[in-house]
Amino acid sequence: MGSDGSSLSPKVSQPGHTEIVDHVSEKVITNGKNVNKKVNAEVDGKSMVEKVKTHEENAEDYHYGGYHPVYIGEEFHHRRYVVERKLGWGHFSTVWLAYDRAAKRRVALKVVRSAEHYRETSIDEIRILQKIREGDEKHLGKKHIISLLDYFVHRGPNGAHVCMVFEVLGENLLSLIQSYGHRGVPVGIVKQIAYQLLIALDYLHRECGIIHTDLKPENVLICIDQDALQHIEAPATTSSPTSNTSSSKTRNNTGYTAKAPIIKRGQSVDNSAQERKTFAKNPTKNSKPAGQVIPSSPFTSTLSRFPSLEGAVSEISLRDSQKHNSHPNSPFSSGDNSLILDGVNGSQEPVPKITVKIADLGNACWTRKHFTNDVQTRQYRSPEVILGCRWGASADCWSFACIIFELLTGDYLFDPRNGNSYSKEDDHIAQIIELLVNYPKQMALSGKHSRDLFNRRGELRNIHKLKFWPLKDVLEQKYHFSAELAQQISDFLSPMLCFDPAKRTNAGYMSNSPWLREVADPTFKIETTGATGEDVPGWATEIR
């Protein structure tokens, strides 16, 4: 099996027995253990924002080629996995909390819609997850990417569904941001998150040749151990079907719920008329009647269950910004599971440890094979993608910088809006230029969409009055960070907010930043040949 994105196809054998076959090598790929998890981004994206009204999948999508009618107590894969409750859903799949009888633990089970293009997309995702699994164990970044534990094909009345089994993680970073009232997460906690994400990105980019393409707070999950999961009670409503509810889109929706997945090209899956007849005559036992939908029952705040994330922060990890980051209702405490970091006025203070993992690789691609140019969620979208220029792994570092700013301040770094005489794209590029002040006009004019945004002189076509506001000044004037801390943050983020993707600093190099020294693993250091992506193939453009 190569790492170039050539597709796998699920081969359905006898009922109840399936295997995924690599048609390139004709080898059976055994059910994987330990890869990644696209599921929880969908799961936790909803769980973290329970305050916002949740909606369910459309009952009309339960048909041949659509969702599998999962029911509580249903058994999957030779009775190994038993469904306990519904965690979430997306246009791509539904996600369920299940008990793994073999491993004696709870897992997240994602059941993909059975239509051919959804199956093909899931096979692409599995290939990417396998590449991540097979990478160098010595690279610590691997531990900060979610793990796929198993995969198989499940046959039901609506067709053959690719299923993926993931480790269950806690809530995502959006939940963390909200728990601090959008006023900023303590700096000591942000530093830990930043370091872990950077080494994870270096592992993806340098070791695996993979670009995430959709980094955002919703797709970074906080780890939670199995002991906490053992005490999660099943809600009383999980077995009660309900009709489809509101379909309004809100910020809490993540990769799956915010938009349909990007459809990738791959080898077609056999979807014969005979298979359709077989399922019509022999539907799965106890399957739900058409038109009924089990309501999602995501976890209540897992932050409160995570041992190192309980209690209040009081005055830890505030680093010169006590007023900015003082939150009496914070979910963190300074227990035994903590770090001692430099605090205010040179003092040393305990900061709770936090471990995060990158999730949702459903839109990921290879550095040598981009599936689409429609990548990145709006607020985390890089200028090269907006302009329609060539892009590469460095686009992830732009998104990373936007996430760190949001963690520190509680606000988006860029939040473009439509105007009477300009588009969101106009406003987005204008906001970027206002922050960076300078930009390469040659690049600005080189994209597929450049003529819509710039005139021949490289000036914005539809927005003429700009208010330049460099990052350090934004942090100091708007968010009241001290001048020293604002400078430190600006020095850390600015190299990854370079307009030109080829000159953007790579993740491995930034993991060695002095700003992260106190949270970095002293036994692990990423050696790079330069600050930018000289030694990262596909850094700024697709490898051809």
From Swiss-Prot:
Reactions that this protein is recorded to catalyse: L-seryl-[protein] + ATP = O-phospho-L-seryl-[protein] + ADP + H(+); L-threonyl-[protein] + ATP = O-phospho-L-threonyl-[protein] + ADP + H(+)
Gene Ontology annotations for the cellular component aspect, listed alphabetically: cell division site; cytoplasm; cytosol; mitotic spindle pole body; nucleus; spliceosomal complex
Chief location bin: cytoplasm
EC number(s) stated in the UniProt entry for this protein: 2.7.11.1
Keywords, alphabetical: ATP-binding, Cell cycle, Cell division, Cytoplasm, Kinase, Mitosis, Nucleotide-binding, Nucleus, Phosphoprotein, Serine/threonine-protein kinase, Transferase
Top EC category: transferase
Coiled-coil stretches: none
Chain sites annotated for binding ATP: 87-95, 110
Membership in a protein family: Belongs to the protein kinase superfamily. Ser/Thr protein kinase family.
Protein name per Swiss-Prot or TrEMBL: Protein kinase dsk1
Organism: Schizosaccharomyces pombe (strain 972 / ATCC 24843)
